[in-house]
């Protein structure tokens, strides 16, 4: 809530939460994972530039919804080039073929997920909630 002198203005949760989670450095990305209960191998398995689609199909809309639930807003990043870092997660229950994907834009984490890498595997939030 922001006070404007008249009526309080309610800010969306993602706007308050995601003022910027540092992610430009590998140590920052690993710390982000650890703070949320995940252990990852260093260095990243991969680092690649990806573009957030301007038009979202049903799958990407679901991914954006998962990110929104964690406090991230991909809506404002449509068409933007981001860097995707992929880390092998070592403490996922009953599955060792699991990766964390962290999207970084202007040195800030803008999206993250934990994915089972086999065909049909699940994609879940990094941030518990």
Ranges and model annotations:
Residues 95-129:
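A short, surface-exposed interaction/processing loop segment used at functional sites
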Residues 14-21, 88-91, 99-100, 114-116:
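Second-shell loop/turn segments in exported
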Residues 1-62:
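N-terminal export/targeting and maturation segments
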Residues 16, 62, 81, 86, ...:
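Residue-level preference for alpha-helix termini and adjacent loops
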Residues 35-95:
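Mature extracytoplasmic domains of secretory-pathway proteins
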């Amino acid at each position: 809530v922001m006070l404007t002198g008249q009526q309080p203005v309610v800010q969306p949760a993602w706007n308050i939460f995601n003022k910027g989670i540092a992610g430009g450095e590998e140590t920052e990305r690993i710390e982000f994972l650890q703070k949320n209960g995940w252990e990852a191998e260093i260095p990243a398995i991969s680092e690649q530039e990806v573009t957030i689609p301007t038009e979202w199909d049903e799958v990407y809309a679901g991914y954006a919804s998962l990110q929104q639930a964690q406090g991230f807003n991909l809506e404002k990043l449509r068409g933007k080039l981001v860097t995707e870092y992929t880390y092998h997660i070592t403490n996922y229950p009953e599955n060792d073929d699991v990766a964390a994907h962290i999207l970084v834009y202007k040195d800030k984490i803008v999206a993250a997920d934990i994915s089972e890498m086999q065909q049909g595997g699940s994609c879940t939030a990094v941030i518990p909630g």
